Amino acid sequence: MSWFVLVIAGLFEVVWAVGLKYTHGFTRLIPSLITASAVALSMGLLAYAMKGLPIGTAYAVWTGIGAVGTAIFGIIVFGESASFARILSFALIIAGIIGLKLSS
């Protein structure tokens, strides 16, 4: 259950990270409220997941999901670079997440 909650927390991290772009420095109300809510949910779920997972593993997986998810969103939605080096780097992060899961 902790792993499932951690993945959901990571997905909410993607929501708030992407949401920051839409807040325009927190000058737009609705995107700002959505972003703030996503931050609260992400942190709350991360804290809950940490009750059943080692702190280092949980934090590394959470940031990995957020980083890769946000970068993939940027490639798909904002047309950011999808170079070989960038994709390889994402694959290494994902491999690290899988390694942490398998070693827990």
UniProtKB/Swiss-Prot annotation:
It is a multi-pass membrane protein. The chain crosses the membrane at residues 2-19, 29-48, 55-77, 82-100. SUPFAM superfamilies: Multidrug resistance efflux transporter EmrE. GO terms for biological process: monoatomic ion transport. Keywords: Cell inner membrane, Cell membrane, Ion transport, Membrane, Transmembrane, Transmembrane helix, Transport. One of its GO terms (cellular component) is plasma membrane. Its main location: membrane. Residues 1, 49-54, 101-104 are cytoplasmic. InterPro entries: Small_drug/metabolite_transptr, Small_multidrug_res. It comes from the Bacteria. Residues 20-28, 78-81 are periplasmic. GO terms for molecular function: transmembrane transporter activity. It is found in: Cell inner membrane. Belongs to the drug/metabolite transporter (DMT) superfamily. Small multidrug resistance (SMR) (TC 2.A.7.1) family. Gdx/SugE subfamily. Guanidinium ion exporter. Couples guanidinium export to the proton motive force, exchanging one guanidinium ion for two protons. This is Guanidinium exporter.
